[in-house]
């Protein structure tokens, strides 16, 4: 109802172009980046556009402090595959983000500098007024002086909202673009900040395997914390899925009209 909706792309034969994209790779040594070029052309019967091939490849530690360079990857596939033949999912490690200069300045590889998120749950708890919000509603009041009354509908308390986070949500997985994860671009496009994660459990680490919340399905590893994120202590039935607190700030400003409700962020109304 609110926000943008993205429809699946369909081919319109009446508007079909005779152009197509074709990726063309050139292999090179480990010290130079591989490149991809595009060529225009194709016949009028072409109905498919090929995605460009983009790649990353990590240099050896003795070359340029082990920085990364391009190697074949197809951005149209999700999750992104590393390499063209092994079909393995990308597992980011600390050294994938480069290294800091060596303290001895000897030219050797320095200490790995892993990327860290800019916002963690603990930071939200430290400054509640900054992250709290109140949902107000304005309605017609004929006997009021200005014919308008304001009432508080709900209050967003980040400490309460994050109390039931699964373990992997304790440190939100923001990538270097400032998005929630690799699918967060869909969240930002299709919502104003309020959405039901039960419709898209795959956005949240398979945090809810069944939309009706009959299973927790938290599929990370076999540790004791596997399914504790959706259960209360000592209870057998799963607790309702927690809406990520950051979702409320995904695509809305500090003062936003939402139907007849007015959302005011950064203040606490008791």
UniProtKB/Swiss-Prot annotation:
Pfam families xrefs: P1_N
Protein name, UniProt field: Uncharacterized protein MPN_462
Database matches in InterPro entries: P1_N
The species this protein was found in: Mycoplasma pneumoniae (strain ATCC 29342 / M129 / Subtype 1) (Mycoplasmoides pneumoniae)
Region (Disordered): 1-115, 215-236
Domain of life: Bacteria
Composition bias, Basic and acidic residues: 1-10
Low complexity biased stretches: 26-41, 98-113
Family: Belongs to the adhesin P1 family.
